[in-house]
Amino acid sequence: MRCFVFSLLTTIVLSSCSHKNEAIELTRSFFTSLSDSTYGSPTDFYPQYDSLQIEAKSDVVDIEESDITVKNDSIIVRCMNNYTDAKGTFKQDSVVIFITKDKDSEWYIYNSRGLITIDKDIEWFGKKTGALGKKPMNDLQLAEVLGKLYSLMRKKYWEQYIELKTQVEILDWSWETSYDGTAHGEARIKNKLPYSVSGIKYQVTYYDRQHNYMAEDDGSVSKTLNPEEKYNFTFWSSNAKYPSRARLTLEFSDRGVYDLLKAKYYTGTEFQEYIKKGKKQDKRTKEI
């Protein structure tokens, strides 16, 4: 009986070691494929990799056998992915790889955690709107959430941008040409919003007598406009000689729009409300 038990334990240990070795090989193969296309496609090892909608990078992956957990036909590999990003900065990410067997008893990666890196703005927005919590998500689930979160953020971005375009207005402006043909002028603008606005930019587009485009010039309004405040600024353009017509427009930087989004109050239920609204719209579309 003791011999049987010992033999059984030995078999289990050997099987576990074998599975760990297979998991290490599979994981290394996957990370190698991220930087070496001749080695294979990432989807050869991680069938749903394309669903993550990322281009992960890897130079070296560090795997310790002690960081591998085997449970029946599932294996969890915790590793460190070392790489240099597009900006030339060295990165080291903690990644978890989830492995199981397919119907042919072949090992494959069915999920991961840590391959997706989140932009700071979208991470902040996700936490404020209730899309991202404190508990980290696995990558496949995170990719699905991020797709919807980006849509919500674009919606909020354009709402904010349109509000700026319509409520920070040009009250009056004029321009003329100097003796050398260069154009210069002045404008008066007003902030009709209940909050301060900074980072206002302007663009002047010049045309000839046939309304053909000649050139454009841009600049920034150096002042932060408080609610209901009016402000005059001047501009000088040297890249259009003797224009006949001109058009002045106000623009707002992405950073300025995002800063205003960050200043808003959020209940933490915006993401779920957006999802519910989307489902209702889909249902109505199907009923038509």
Residue ranges and their predicted role:
Residues 15-16:
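C-terminal motif of bacterial Sec signal peptides marking the signal peptidase cleavage site
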Residues 25-82:
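Short solvent-exposed beta->alpha transition segments
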Residues 31, 109-167, 223-227, 265-288:
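Low-complexity, intrinsically disordered terminal/linker segments enriched in charged
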Residues 71-145, 193:
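Exposed beta-sheet edge and beta->alpha loop/turn motif
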Residues 183-191:
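Short, well-ordered beta-strand segments enriched in hydrophobic/aromatic residues
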Residues 191-195, 210:
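Short, acidic/polar linear motifs in exposed loop/turn regions
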Residues 196-202, 213-218:
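Short, hydrophobic/aromatic beta-strand segments
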Residues 209-277, 286-287:
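Short, solvent-exposed, Trp/other aromatic-anchored flexible loops in extracytoplasmic proteins
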